[in-house]
């Protein structure tokens, strides 16, 4: 069973998607349509902008989404998912690629999500940190006992958990987790506390947009971040997409569930190979690859 996985924020690089634009007429048309929908030339920033420009949430999220969904489209018959999942933002890419969301609706939602998240970040200074070398329970326990808002945000792979919270909370958590034996507690260069209760304002804003968007049944089950289970029912998919903004990305469990349900290979669709590395940390033996255009 072929599993397809779609990356989230952090996978971006200048030059991403340029080969697609140059090699495929279909890709060119979709990129130009995206420039129109967004109201700015995102292709200029993706292909030849600065890291600084590309790193803004409102650019990064649509950029990664576009790279993933346009690549899946251009692959045509070579893209036949039997199960799919996306990390955070990647969940939207997975849904478009699996036919549950139209390209236009997906892009509108991703742009709305990015803007809502950027606004929520400006309300209260907040951040995230990667905690390496501790078990999930220890990290959960330390976060739970702090008075500031700090929560597990991304369960990336065994021994790698990203936490999210107020700046004071993250500082306190990093100190306590280092004392508890973490190999590293690394503050991340992100705009804010994604996947935490601090994103509540963004969740409310996005809920309105998602409720009014048509979601169809996908061609294959989508394993969603919020509980790592497979879904095909459009109403449940919507509910989970809304919950995702303030809840954790359960990536370790997602990979485990896909393996239990018969995944024999994982293909990453989009920029970078971060997710392949995370899959290997769950199961060293399973084959992983990046989706590429035929030569």
Residue spans of the language-model regions?
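Charged catalytic carboxylate motif
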Residues: 26, 67, 169, 205, ...
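FabD-like malonyl-/acyl-CoA
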Residues: 1-138, 184, 188, 265-294
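Non-catalytic positions within long, well-ordered alpha-helices that form the structural scaffold/packing
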Residues: 76, 178, 259-262
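A short, acidic, amphipathic alpha-helical segment used as a generic capping/interface helix at domain edges
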Residues: 248-263
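Alpha/beta catalytic cores of group-transfer enzymes, especially the acyltransferase/condensing modules
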Residues: 9-11, 38, 98-247
């Amino acid at each position: 069973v072929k599993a397809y996985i779609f990356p989230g924020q952090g996978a971006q690089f200048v030059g991403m998607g340029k080969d697609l634009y140059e090699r495929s007429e279909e890709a060119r048309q979709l990129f130009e349509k995206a420039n129109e929908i967004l109201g700015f030339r995102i292709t200029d920033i993706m292909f030849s902008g600065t890291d600084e420009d590309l790193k803004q949430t409102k650019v990064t999220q649509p950029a990664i989404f576009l790279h993933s969904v346009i690549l899946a489209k251009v692959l045509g018959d070579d893209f036949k998912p039997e199960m799919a999942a996306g990390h955070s933002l990647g969940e939207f890419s997975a849904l478009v690629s699996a036919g549950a969301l139209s390209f236009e609706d997906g892009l509108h939602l991703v742009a709305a999500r990015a803007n809502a998240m950027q606004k929520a970040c400006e309300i209260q200074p907040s951040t995230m940190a990667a905690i390496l070398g501790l078990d999930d329970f220890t990290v959960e326990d330390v976060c739970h006992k702090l008075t500031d808002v700090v929560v597990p945000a991304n369960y990336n792979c065994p021994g790698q958990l990203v936490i999210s919270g107020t700046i004071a909370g993250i500082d306190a958590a990093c100190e306590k987790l280092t004392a508890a034996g973490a190999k590293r507690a690394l503050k991340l260069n992100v705009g804010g506390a994604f996947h935490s209760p601090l994103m509540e304002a963004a969740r409310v804003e996005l809920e309105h947009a998602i409720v009014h968007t048509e979601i169809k049944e996908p061609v294959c089950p989508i394993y969603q971040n919020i509980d790592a289970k497979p879904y095909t029912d459009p109403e449940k998919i919507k509910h989970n997409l809304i919950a995702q903004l303030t809840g954790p990305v359960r990536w370790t469990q997602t990979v485990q569930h896909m393996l239990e349900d018969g995944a024999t290979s994982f293909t990453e669709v989009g920029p970078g190979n971060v997710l392949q590395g995370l899959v290997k940390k769950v199961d060293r033996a399973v084959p992983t690859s990046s989706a590429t255009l035929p030569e």
